[in-house]
Design a protein with these regions (language model features):
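Conserved active-site segments centered on acidic
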Residues: 2-19
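A short acidic-Thr-Gly-centered motif at the start of a beta-strand
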Residues: 17-20, 74-86
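Aromatic- and Gly/Pro-rich amphipathic surface segment
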Residues: 50-80
Length: 178
């Protein structure tokens, strides 16, 4: 299969693109060596504010929507960066968009992908590390932070949680100018 991931994402998202969604990002999940494992397509309809986020994987027939089967749990996003900086503190946020914004600002950041993915993820790459949880400023964000904190504490991590309620009226990290 010679189709580039970007072209495959456009093909697989064609229906949403016809409905007015615009591409925002194609997030690549890799192993610690940088080998691609799967991608997440992110589109946004700027008229409605709705997001369209779908996983994409490469199988024997080409790129298709869906995630590979991960018996040990889904990999963390930016896993290569985590492996390259094993002694640095890590910021965990809810989505790839936020992790990329933090990385652009110079922080080491990762995510499990979404507020409901904490229990479906392989967090062992963070074992014993200093971790700062930066949840979204909503109920789902608090549930996510609580779930991730419990998992990380069991892995021997030192965990800090950003109290987003005291920040200036922001819903999510990327609303803050970084």
């Amino acid at each position: 299969m010679n189709e580039a991931p970007q072209l495959a994402a456009r093909r697989l998202a064609a229906g949403a693109l016809r409905e007015g969604y615009k591409p925002q990002a194609l997030h690549k999940y890799t192993d610690t060596d940088g080998t691609p494992l799967h991608w997440r397509i992110r589109l946004k309809n700027h008229d409605t504010g709705d997001k369209w986020i779908r996983p994409m994987k490469l199988n024997g027939d080409g790129y298709v929507l869906g995630e590979p089967d991960y018996p040990e749990g889904k990999p963390l996003y930016r896993l290569r960066d985590l492996a390259a900086q094993p002694d640095d503190p890590v910021i965990v946020c809810e989505g790839e968009w936020c992790a990329d914004a933090l990385a652009k600002a110079g922080a080491l950041a990762t995510t499990s992908g979404a507020a409901d993915s904490a229990g479906k993820t392989d967090w062992r790459a963070l074992a014993g590390r200093r971790v700062i949880l930066w949840p979204d400023n909503d109920e789902a964000g608090q549930r996510y932070a609580d779930a991730v904190a419990a998992i990380l504490l069991a892995l021997g991590c030192t965990v800090f949680i950003v109290d987003v309620a005291v920040l200036v009226d922001v819903a999510v990290l990327v609303d803050v100018e970084v």
